[in-house]
Amino acid sequence: MKKRKIKAIIEKGKDQRFSIYSKDHFGNSYFGGFGASVAAAKEDFLESVKEAIEEERADGNTVFSIDNIVIEYSYDIPSFFNFFDFINVSRFAEYAGVNESKMRAYKSGVSFPGEKTTAKIFRAVRKIGAELTAATLL
């Protein structure tokens, strides 16, 4: 069966909590999630997707099953480092060619990178992903 993709955006709020929202929806049912961590917000978001499926079915509408839904997450920088907390920010800054103290400020959400710096960070994330994908263990 075909998979239904939901694009979700994760951001750290001024209240230091994480929110997830999406422009995608099932009929009149929209999705959202909140939490003290990205992991908690993802759990809440997934629960809202399940509730939307139930509501649509209760209204007699045909919707995808939860097993046929793929959620594609986009992160702001603070959420990225919250979820992937095993990444050392100082080492990542060096790898990406970004000032270490600025990178810590981006991670905490105190300041935000410009377009060029965001592109550098994105390229570094993609490069790490490619290197990990190409790696094998003996």
Where do the PLM segments sit?
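DNA major-groove recognition helix of helix-turn-helix/homeodomain DNA-binding modules
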Residues: 116-134
